Swiss-Prot record:
Residues 35-69 form the SAP domain. InterPro entries: SAP_dom, UPF0746_actin_org. One of its GO terms (molecular function) is DNA binding. This is UPF0746 protein DDB_G0281095. Residues 329-521 form a coiled coil. Residues 12-22 have a biased composition (Acidic residues). PROSITE patterns: SAP. Belongs to the UPF0746 family. Residues 1-11 have a biased composition (Basic and acidic residues). Residues 1-24 are annotated as: Disordered. The keyword DNA-binding applies. Keywords: Coiled coil, DNA-binding.
Amino acid sequence: MVNNNKRKEIENQENDNDDDNDGLLTYKKFKDVDYDSIRSKELQTIAKSLGLPNNGKKQEVYKRIEGYFLSKKVKNDLTNSTTNQPPQLQQKQPQQKQYVLLIKDVDQLEIYFWKAFRNMIIFKNIFSNFKSKQFGYHDLIGINENFLKSYSNSLEIIKDNIKGNINHQIIRSVNDIVNIIKTLKKKDNETISFYTTLFSTFSSSSSTTTTMQSTKSLIFQFDENIDLWIQRMILNENLVALDQFIKFFKINSDVLKKSIEMHINPSFFNVFSYNNLKIYNYLKSINAIPTSHIKQRFSNIDLSESLSFDYKFKRLIKSYKLLVDPTKFKEIREIHQQQQQQQQQQQQQQQQQQQEQQKQQEQKQQQQEQEQQQQQQQQQQQQQQQQQEQQQQQEQQQQEQQQEQEQQQQQQQEEQQQEQQQQQQQQQQQQEQQEQEQQQQQQQQQQQQQQQQQQQQQQQQQQQQQQQQQQQQQQQQQQQQQQQQQQQQQQQQQQREGRQLQILDYIEKLDQLILELNEIQFSHFTDDQLNSTIKNLLNQTKTTTTTPILITNNNNCSDLKDIIKKYYKSIYLFLKIIEEGKHDRNLMRPFHYYLYFKKKMNVSQLYEIFCGFFIKKYDDCLIFFKSILIDQQLERNQRLELVSKILDIENGVSFQNIGSNFNFTSFNSFCRVVFSTNDTELIDHLIKTIKKLQLAQNSKTQFPSISYIISINFQYINKNEIVDFFFENYRNETTLFDDQNQNWNNNHVNIIDHIEKIMESIGKKLQLYFVKYSNWFTNGNKNNEKKYNVNILLDQLKRAISKPLLYSFFFDSGYYCNTTLLNIFGWSLENGNEVVINFFLPNEIFKQPFRFSDIIYGAPSPNKIPNLIKLIFNNISKESIEPKLYQVKGNFNIPHLYYGRDDFIPLTSTISTTNSEEVGQFIIGETKSFDFIISPRMLFICLYYLDRFEDIFYLFDKIPEIFSSTYFPNFTKESYLYNICSSYYLELLINYFIENLNDNTINHLYNCLCVASGKGFTQIFKNILSSNKNSQSLLKVRTKTNQSSLFQLNFLCGMVLKSIDSSNFQLSNLLIDSIDFPPKNKRVLNQKYLVHLIINK
């Protein structure tokens, strides 16, 4: 491993409680490192020195190093706590105990049994008679969910594997443990004991043997990555594993908090689910929730799913106890009381502020008015002064003009007297007159300028007035805005007060409910009640008259139904309080809550609530429509009106989804309920209403045809009168009475009898669509209702077969017919009803050969496949198979991708018919033969399932061409053998190929060895190594000097890589050490092995 010496030095000398370890990086020192200042290369160097992968981003490497130190801290704390224990508390070395049999009177036969059972020779002789060696303990490969769910004793198998150190194939990597954590979550003593054993075995403090310890070190150790295992257990919501993990390694809250901060997103705890609440409450109870991860509010609340009425009653009680925490509720109540007090104080402060604001506004208005008045007065004074100045100037000008005129008159008089003297001066006077005219013009201009100035002053006054008006308008707008803001604030305040009052009302109601429910304990209910679904319990309270449990509280009694309602109401109120209306739509109660508990609501109100649920499941729709059409016991007119209202697409939304087309789920369930009423008038009203609405339908409201509606719902009719009604009124609008129609299926014998009579009277046949029955016989149909329907369908099939003049069969194609037959056979074997197979196979209708090649991938469960094969191949011998193989022998060398018709072998088998008679343990009666075709590959698989390997080898010897490289690899190819072959038979094949080596069998031998390597069958390779001849030919590199070996270097490297890729580390070590690889190739394989080992840790 990378820099192992440095890592061991740190592991041996590191002590987190000692700060004097200069030169060594401790957890405390690493925590002091500034993440922003340290460079990525430095972190990579530290990771490399610790033997950790140093690839990835800076944050990934940092978390990897921090996780390493957290794990070291847990190891040191665990070692110190064990060392510091008083001697009397430390574990004592186990001493050999003498076991005493407590039962005194033991039957003599039992003593003989145990003597024989413990005798190895007798034991092996007895169990050698058990032929089935397909799968054994050594064939269990890894751990997946199928393994954990398929085997009821899966826990015990894993325990035995861990304790016995058997093959190290069940737990081979981290992924195997993760699959365990994903699956095993049930809290019981068995699971708790299992996890304790698991953690004890795969930890550095384990006291197991040296061999086991070395094997474990090849896989992983839990305390190497404490933080990552905490992350995996929390994310997979496995509380049992997490609790035992914390207790076993004595992990303190600081380590848990740090691990959660490193690897868990805070939003993970905001999910509203049952398991998430369990994990969160547990971590909170041990003070392991970081501040950043404290649940503030739920990110998504879907009560219709999380509080479904399909869950068990005890889960509802546990959900209530997990969610409605009295301590948290007390804190919430105190918080809301404080908020109410704060709101009252805020109201008083707001009122004072409003009063002060009003006073300030009034003062501002007064000041503004005074300023405006002053400005107006000043403007008036200025105007008056300007006018006075202008008048004075005009008066002066007038006086000057008068003086000038008087002077001019005097001068004229003198001129008249002295005409002769003034003639010489006339030119001068004319000039003076011109000057006077100019002066007059100037005066006029001055007057015009004065007028313009006056106009400008008037305009300025108007502008000032407009500005004043605008200011007044702005002030008014500001006042209006302030008033609107005040109104909005008042409305918001009223809403807050209303919500606060509503929440306080919720708190009072919830407080009362908590007091009532605190008196209820699990012991008050029976186990049947606790393990029953809520829906079943509520249905029982309707139909039964058994005495319900009574809980007395303040002289108030409540039955089981009322208790269930209180649990739901308490959870709903609690979520309303903590969410404060943030998720009103998701906080809608499950629809069944309204059906069972809101009896005061009328049908219209229930219908409106139902339309508000966008996700409508078929069963929920059935319950709703049944409750309003049948359980409500409405009068005839009310039922007719209700049908019309539900079908009214324009006013209702029951059959529409937003953004999608017609909702057939709710419509089909509605029609089913109407037909189930067997009310002729109601059914007729439904059909006629749909016909009217079809005239105005569009792409989103397109109803199915009337023929489809009648045909698909005919199965729910149980009265002959309804059949006659359809025949008389809708014969031309439905295919129900057409010749060769397939719509006659019904679950009631009287209806089938009646329609048979009608069809016989009109001279027409019914048709049975055989392929349509296929899905009814698959393993998916597990509930009782469908099992009942399967029995009815089988009766219908038998009826049709027994009446060939009235029924015809439609097979569609041979493939689907064969699939349906196989599904029927699989169902028959699953339910122990092999008589059905005896009825169908020899029948003339199914006489054509059917294809058997899809049986492995068909309907029967894997553990039932051998039974079906045994039933069909019971009378087929190897001698009868041999000539059939010779017939297709010529095709073995023809390359092809898919098998054609010529590649299938026709075979014939016999089976007892239903006419046989049982006599004791034997069946005496008529036997009939039936034909089928099968590919050679599938033939060998069937022989393999029947433990008939001797027959396979017999056919190999008789027909060597079967080993052709173009054909036989389809059976011995690696991927196929990996899925079906056990270690026992795989070793048989390997030995057979070794004894019969040729150019073809070498390829098959290599495939088998690759399968053994990939599966981790270490014992097969140990057996090969124990034989010098086999080891030299199989596990040595073929070179020019070593021609005795079969495989070249690249083939052997590929075989080793199979074990590395499959995490078979023990086998990988064995093969790398045993095969004579060149140093370069051995180095490459070791590097790949180490990289894969680090990744899996």
